[in-house]
Amino acid sequence: YYNIECNCIGTVLVGVGPQRNNREHAPADVTAQIQRWSSLGRTPFEERVEEVTWEVALVVPYTVFFKHQITSLDGKEIKANFYKCGDELQTPHFLSWNPIEIEQPCFI
């Protein structure tokens, strides 16, 4: 299981492991391979309390899946979901692209 996290300015974290706990984090030379763009730029900032819209785009090469030697997705079935987590914000919120089919999803 690979977990790729990204904030609104394109800072990424990649982890791999069978469960949520004790995942191995990708080294910096691996995460540096992810191309990223953010409409908010790349400079960190404090929480913005006014209404803000933003976009982020990532290009994730096969090499980011650093525990496997993936060179093609031909003939493979993969699954993914996208989440937006604002658990540490003034107004906590959570969104997902696809439905989460468990009663109480955990976003931490």
Regions found by a protein language model. Give the residues of each.
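Structural preference for beta-rich elements and adjacent junctions enriched in aromatics
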Residues: 1-108
